[in-house]
Amino acid sequence: MQTSGLTLEPPGVASPATLAVAAVTFLTALVLYELFTYRKRRSMPPGPFRWPFIGNTLQIPQVHPWLTYSRWAQVYGDILHLDALGQHIIVINSAKIARELLDKRSAIYSGRPHLVMAGDLAGQDRLLILQPYGDEFRQQRRFISQDLSVAAVRRYYDIQEAAARRLVLGVINDPGSLESQIKVNIASIIMLVTYGYTVKGTDDPFITRPFEVMDNFNASMTPGVWIVDMIPQLKYLPLWTPGATFLKTAKVWRKHLFTTNWMVYSWSKESSENGTARVPNLCASVLTEMEGKVTPQLEESLMWAAGTVLGGGLDTNISTILSFILAMLRFPDVQRKAQVEIDAVVGSERLPEISDRPSLPYIRSVVTEVYRWLPAIPLCIPHALTEDDVYNGVFLPKGSVVMPNVWHMLHDPTIYPDPDAFKPERYGGLDSEMKKVTDLAFGFGRRACPGYQFAQGTIFTIVATMLATCDIVPVVDEHGQNSIPDVGYTTGTIIFPVDVKCTFRPRTEQARAALVEASVL
């Protein structure tokens, strides 16, 4: 229809002139955006093609991201840059660069990025592992470091050794209970050392609840899953907002985190005072040292420090032991060589102890190779850069999320030839070579794991006890063939080998009898 010589467009249809103006406006904004960001980007590390405005948001992988970053390292080099909706992400694929930045420049690389789902909403940033660098971080770390120092951990050797023996005996008696035996015995070590609590069994709420907390932690840290991490303003939505299920999820997780940590801490405090908790333990030691000077703030710091030891030690140690078993199934020659060393050094009259560690270089090499072959945390929990920095002429802006790709560092074929093979011999029995691996596996700078000496003792005694007493052999399938599991693993902050099934066959009846005799603490 025409009116006064003009053509009227149907309702809701933009005219060509309107479309032209919109297109020009968009292109102008795009050009201005590119000009505004180009100067900064040209001196930053290289990285994959980035789209205007959204950057690399759609390219950041949610499944096994360390493998993608490892492939990108072949194209872009040892340090690469990603842009997620304006958030700079620096991925480091080189151990040398990671040490230079995160260790030597730790004063500006020790922050944590602002994690909305895990921190603001779920409350996980109260734990040391996500705590911003500052006074509270230093206080919690001091509590842990004092009780789990090289000298202090010796008083916990008997706990670790007894649990290792119960674990192996439990798997011998019930081959289908491998994972549950690993879980309950590692949890029993940590609960006794941290709180003085003796675990009652696999369904004890003092361990089932912490495992649930760790599941929530891993879920909250998964990149790209929570829209609120990309659009932080969404955290202010009312709880009843349609579609904002993340708010309800975070509320449940937060309550579970706080009530679980208070439950185990308050039990430890009361039981240490009335003499029913096993002492020494971390909480009792700190409270005794602070006698008369305990403030509510210090007590809360202790609660979260203890919770960090519990949470940080559960899944990582479980992952490492499962990876060790997988390696023994796939590389039986390594298992036999390790057993020869134990037999020669320890003999058959007793079980190995943590104090034997200096005399067992091949066993130490096996443990180190497990850390390298399947690191429990392949992509280090991100650091945050608190000031602008320059490395080898490359600009690294303040506020960047810094992600050390530990997987790539430990699978770099130029440093570790044939990286997918399990070869303890690659260290030549030298602790100096093994340290290069453990230094990467346990974190960087001021964020390095304060309980690594304790963790290494736990892993060593379990590995040595398994090798001394049992042959770890594949299960037999319905066709009578050995069923050797593939090297597959989950995704997430902490990863686990999948479908690890085996049989623990006692090497001698004497070995079984020794386990029975020694498994009671």
Curated annotation (Swiss-Prot):
Pathway: Secondary metabolite biosynthesis
Top-level taxon: Eukaryota
One Pfam family here: p450
Entry-listed glycosylation sites: N218, N274, N317
EC number: 1.-.-.-
InterPro entries: Cyt_P450 (IPR001128), Cyt_P450_CS (IPR017972), Cyt_P450_E_grp-I (IPR002401), Cyt_P450_sf (IPR036396), Cytochrome_P450_fung (IPR050364)
Protein family per UniProt: Belongs to the cytochrome P450 family.
Protein name: Cytochrome P450 monooxygenase 105
Upper classification of the organism: Eukaryota, Fungi, Dikarya, Basidiomycota, Agaricomycotina
Gene it is expressed from: CYP105
